Regions:
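Conserved beta-strand edge residues that scaffold enzyme active sites
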Residues: 1-2, 51-52, 131-133
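A short acidic, Gly/Pro-enriched loop at the edge of an enzyme's catalytic core
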Residues: 2-12
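Short aromatic-enriched loop/helix-cap "lid" or pocket-rim segments at secondary-structure transitions
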Residues: 8-9, 56-60, 140
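A short SAM/SAH-binding and catalytic strip from SAM-dependent methyltransferases
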Residues: 10-26
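Short, hinge-like loop/turn segments at secondary-structure boundaries
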Residues: 12-13, 61-65, 144-145
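SAM-dependent methyltransferase
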Residues: 25, 45-112
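A short glycine-rich, Lys/Arg-flanked "PGG" loop and its adjoining helix->strand segment in the class I
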Residues: 28-43
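C-terminal lobe and adjacent flexible extensions of AdoMet/dcAdoMet transferase-like proteins
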Residues: 111-150
Length: 150
């Protein structure tokens, strides 16, 4: 865990939905630990999925059929959590298919909650950028640029 890191840094990043993989229960602890590894005035930059990103972009089913592999990805957003079930079927040399399955869970953190936790963990939010990966109308990601103030 970050409390074991002895060095101090001018900037820390958490990209590709890292905070969405952290439960609401553990999020404040994570932010406190990020604060510990930053120099005074250091920056913390991270992205999170927006509600639109979870509800309209990530949720749904995708299937991919390529030669000797078939992948099914099924994502369901409910109670502020996105559960994604991934199943891979792969053709073996004997002609049979093997099956592997796994699930991942991401949690939606509302902007209001993030702002509250960041303030409580001594971060000033310098900017929040809306990022549109899939549509020009609605942001599916938010990028937070924060500065350690204490």
């Amino acid at each position: 865990a970050l409390e074991n890191v002895k060095e101090k840094f001018n900037c820390a990043t958490a990209i590709f939905d890292v905070l969405n993989y952290i439960s609401k229960r553990d999020l404040k602890k994570f932010l406190k630990e990020i604060n510990l590894v930053l120099n005074q005035g250091g920056y913390f930059i991270f992205d999170v999925n927006s509600a639109f990103g979870f509800e309209e972009v990530a949720q749904g089913t995708i299937t991919i059929d390529v030669e000797d592999k078939f992948i099914a990805i099924d994502a369901n957003f409910e109670d502020n959590k996105l559960q994604t079930d991934i199943t891979l079927f792969e053709k073996q040399e004997n002609g049979f298919f093997s099956k592997q399955s796994d699930s991942i869970i991401q949690e939606y953190h509302p902007k209001k909650s993030l702002l509250k936790f960041l303030k409580e963990c001594n971060f000033e939010v310098i900017d929040i950028k809306e990022f549109n990966l899939h549509t020009s109308e609605n942001a599916d990601k938010l990028i937070f640029i924060c500065k350690k103030i204490a």
